[in-house]
Amino acid sequence: MANMIDKIDLKSQGSSNLSGEMTNHQKVGTLYKRLLLQVKHLWHFLLLAAIGSIFFSAADASMIYLINPILNYGFGPGGGITKQSATILMLMGVGMVGLLALRSVGSFVSQYFIGSLGQKVVYKFRKDIYKRLMDLPASFFDKHSTGQIISRLLYNVDQVIEATSTAIITVVQDGTFVIGLIVVMFVSSWQLSLFLIVVGPFLGLFISIINKKFRNLSRNTQSSMGNVTHTAEETIRNYKEIRIFGAQQKQQNKFFKNLDYTYSQQIRTIALDALTSPVIQIIASLVLAFSLFTIAIFGTNEGDGSSWLTAGSFASFFAAAAAILKPIKNLTKVNVVIQKAVAATEDIFYILDYPAEKETGSKELAKVDGNVTIKDLSFAFGEHKVLSGVSVDIKAGQTVAFVGKSGSGKTTLTSIISRFYTQHEGEILLDGVDTRELTLENLRSHLSIVSQNVHLFDDTVYNNIAFGLSREVSEEEVIDALKRANAYEFVQELSDGINTNIGNNGSKLSGGQRQRISIARALLKNAPVLIFDEATSALDNESERVVQQALESLTKSCTTIVIAHRLSTVENADKIVVMDGGRVVESGKHQELLEQGGLYTRLYQSGLQ
């Protein structure tokens, strides 16, 4: 049997789940316990569902047992119906109606409360995961793709609902039914029932073998589903680039490869699942056949020919024995669901247990002038040194442009200023206070970011501009920000003005329009420090001119740190910091640096692109 199961190949083809491999049974047990703790506070739902299941199963088992008295006492000698037997039959009929009513009530109660329990657990998981994602550090999102994370939030949680609803109701309802049927069999004939005990060890051995197989298959399937989701999300997001560069076939092959692996794992799960029930039924059938041979050989006592097995007890015993196969089959099938849930739960708890963004500060600054001082800053991604000994002094109200080749550390520096990463050495001071001493919320309340890749939300213009502000924002304030960002003219032309939905990431707007909405958002926040990762190189001349005017409006009232790509920005900056290999190699005003004839001069001559 084990060899038969081992033929179902479980080898992973490079897929990896978020949390890594389960290493031992203790870890599996811990996951089970943690999953059960999620329903601990809903014990009354579980109790009511269990009571309903007991009523349901007890009614089913009792109806099967009624075969015994009906056959033994419901008919007279020779199989006819007498007055006495007719009374018994009528009583049995009334009893069956009562049992069916009890069964119906039990079925409703168990399914309703178990279903509600499952939905409550999934609701809680999705809320907890989403809340946790809001607190996770940038390193988490660097390690895991968007598709993988979304798959955990949606697909994995769906697997848990199967364990907390379908699986639990199957275990409770079919489990109590099996117990009830065993009782019926022992009451009908304890001698025959003893033969059924031999099936236990065989079933236990079989189930223990397939448990590990199911768990590995489930883990591989969930991991590959994350890859499928990621590739699909990547394709949808970058559909223009894929078509422009003629990469449809390449991207399709990548998606199909992930899909093929997911399909193969699911087919292996189906094969293993399909193998389980027939084997169990064969074992049970052999036991039943053995019981029939026993009856034929030992069914009568010596001497008077009387039997220890009546027609009624024989019929009720075998009715129960036949009926027990289906719930046993259901119980073995639920193992597939439970193993999927365990694998899914592992990744869910990995996210929930992942260390949150480190909060090192406790101070809060009510008002900030915007003085930013960077002292001997160093940072590395693993073994790769990105910044080394960077020192820059930025006065309040200044516009400082950072220039340098790609990979020189400019963007990383701005991520450290906003504490998405924490420096390994050195310090960054905001108005003389180390940013690590400030709470994350307080520090970021003094910062605005206009990123190179503008990120807008599938919402209205108004909500995108007022995004993140805790106070009520009037339409007049939003319109004022739009005017200062040179965006109000085109917004007025939209179908619903500032209440127009702009689509996924502002897909209904042009590049320049999206840029100006982002600038209007920063204007409304009115933070004393602006981090601007310039992207005007992607715009046409007219859009660039309009955006540049909007930027001038924005930078008048704050300290501006610019990752510069355009000559116009560099020329107008109060200070230019030239970076190379993670170090500051030159610093000064535009004309001063040109006269030095160094790296800045070469970058300037090449257009700074």
UniProtKB/Swiss-Prot annotation:
Pfam families: ABC_membrane (PF00664), ABC_tran (PF00005). GO terms for molecular function: ABC-type transporter activity; ATP binding; ATP hydrolysis activity; ATPase-coupled lipid transmembrane transporter activity. It is found in: Cell inner membrane. Homodimer. This is ATP-dependent lipid A-core flippase. Its main location: membrane. Keywords: ATP-binding, Cell inner membrane, Cell membrane, Lipid transport, Membrane, Nucleotide-binding, Translocase, Transmembrane, Transmembrane helix, Transport. In MsbA the ATP-binding domain (NBD) and the transmembrane domain (TMD) are fused. ATP binds at G404, K405, S406, G407, S408, G409, K410, T411. PROSITE patterns: ABC_TM1F, ABC_TRANSPORTER_1, ABC_TRANSPORTER_2, MSBA. InterPro entries: AAA+_ATPase, ABC1_TM_dom, ABC1_TM_sf, ABC_transporter-like_ATP-bd, ABC_transporter-like_CS, ABC_transpr_lipidA, P-loop_NTPase, Type_1_exporter. It catalyses: ATP + H2O + lipid A-core oligosaccharideSide 1 = ADP + phosphate + lipid A-core oligosaccharideSide 2. It comes from Francisella tularensis subsp. tularensis (strain FSC 198).
